[in-house]
Amino acid sequence: MKTVLIHGKDDLRIEEVPTPEPGPGQVRLKMAYAGICGSDLHYYFEGANGAFVVREPLCPGHEVSGTVDADPSGRLVPGTPVTVHPATFGECLPGLEGHRHLWPRGAYLGSASTWPHTQGGMSEYLIVEAGMVRPLPEGLSLADAALAEPLAVGLHGIAVAGGVAGKRVLVSGSGPIGLLAAAGALASGAAEVTCTDVLPGPLERARALGVQHTLRVGADELPAESYDVVLECSGVPAAINACIAAVRRAGVIAQIGMTSAGPKPVDLATL
């Protein structure tokens, strides 16, 4: 089968590798779509995603969809359209029974965080644990289903923030994650949603989603102490500082965007 492999910084190759066979408890998927996450770009342009350095050829891709190709258990019918929960979980620690995503030694598709690396879905076929497979509801296309994982990021941020129903919500950074978080906030009953970005294009897309207000960073003023919930999706220190000033007293900031490695100048005095 053909697969995309990142060998290091600026070194991406399409190679032929043996088609894998599913073992007990596994399913083989025929891939249809794979989104390109920011982490995938870091692996390509930098040879690393933060502290996770590419040490062997890495197939990226965790925002995926496809169809069932082979299920040795017979539970899933070949051709069934699916997406994938891209994580497997490590060992539970006391007090973390209900928080599997915090368990140490977990793994993630298309990640150099483990050794050997956990290969991702930018290939013709992918082997996953059966429990990672999510059959699609009727009417959801494979193309749209590839957005399930980034949508889940935004929805998780909303859940961590305690929900947004009836609340004034600020989304900082209107890239794909920010826009999906905004869509999730609208669908979850937010009273109003405001999106910010440094570029006009993302703000146009936010308005197309139904967002009530958009603010251009550097051109429009962000009102102070005005939002019940802030979903910070950029990871930019200046934006984090702006969000601290914008959230109301006793409001909530959910930090969804990832910062780059190293200390960051975030002013906590306002809190």
Regions found by a protein language model. Give the residues of each.
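Glycine-rich beta-strand-centered segment in the early N-terminal region that forms part
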Residues: 20-34, 48-96, 137-139
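Mid-domain Rossmann-like dinucleotide-binding core that forms the NAD(H)/NADP(H) cofactor-binding site
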Residues: 79, 137-219
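A short acidic, Gly/Pro-enriched loop at the edge of an enzyme's catalytic core
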Residues: 25, 222-230
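N-terminal glycine-rich cofactor-binding segment
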Residues: 5-21, 38-65, 83-86, 103-117
